């Protein structure tokens, strides 16, 4: 499949391990694609939950997906600074319909003051049994939590202030064309 290019809009779909659709984001603007990564932005993007509820994102958010890492990163740009929501998830695939990944419940939230929290551990444990997550997936996810925490600690990639400034500036340039 041809990679989307800068300024294109794509749909993002997250699934659960059992194959059920979890959440959809419509009209994510692509800022950059490479063979292994996609950087985009959601700004007042329509989100549809699996139960049909809909809502619109409140602030601009730089989104980062990679084909090697078992997480994706949402950097929410707010008046009081940047906060992050990181999903432990399968590497993404891109087809003619959408960018797709499997959401594995565990999340890491990074507040604008730098505080980190691992979220939804109970939900992960319930779904691990209910959906029969294989032990190798459990291991991979736990190892990727460590990678993610290291990225946060060392301000790597999306956790770098310069990264956010560069991609937010590029978004504003594309938006105002």
UniProtKB/Swiss-Prot annotation:
Under Enzyme Commission nomenclature, its number is 3.6.1.15, 3.6.1.6
Q: Where does Mg(2+) 2 bind?
A: 105, 107, 120, 123
Q: Name one GO molecular function term.
A: magnesium ion binding
Query: What are the positions of the active site?
Result: 23
Q: Which cofactor does it need?
A: Mg(2+)
InterPro entries assigned to the protein according to its UniProt record, in alphabetical order: DUF402, FomD-like_sf, Ntdp-like, SA1684
Q: What does this protein do?
A: Has nucleoside phosphatase activity towards nucleoside triphosphates and nucleoside diphosphates.
Q: What family is this protein classified in?
A: Belongs to the Ntdp family.
Which protein is depicted? Answer: Nucleoside triphosphate/diphosphate phosphatase
Q: Which organism is it from?
A: Streptococcus uberis (strain ATCC BAA-854 / 0140J)
């Amino acid at each position: 499949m041809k990679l989307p290019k800068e300024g294109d809009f794509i749909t993002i779909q997250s699934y659960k391990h059992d194959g059920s659709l979890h959440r959809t984001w419509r009209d994510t603007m692509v800022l950059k694609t490479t063979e292994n990564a996609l950087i985009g932005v959601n700004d007042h993007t329509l989100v549809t939950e699996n139960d049909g509820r809909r809502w619109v994102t409140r602030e601009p958010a730089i989104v980062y997906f990679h084909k090697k890492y078992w997480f994706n990163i949402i950097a929410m740009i707010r008046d009081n600074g940047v906060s992050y929501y990181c999903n432990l998830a399968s590497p993404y695939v891109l087809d003619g319909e959408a960018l797709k990944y499997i959401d594995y419940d565990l999340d890491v939230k990074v507040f604008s003051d730098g505080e980190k929290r691992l979220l939804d551990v109970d939900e992960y444990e319930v779904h691990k049994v209910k959906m029969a997550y294989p032990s190798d997936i459990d291991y991979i996810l736990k190892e990727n939590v460590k990678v993610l925490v290291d990225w946060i600690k060392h301000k790597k990639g999306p956790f770098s202030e310069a990264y956010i400034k560069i991609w937010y500036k590029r978004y504003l340039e594309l938006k105002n064309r």
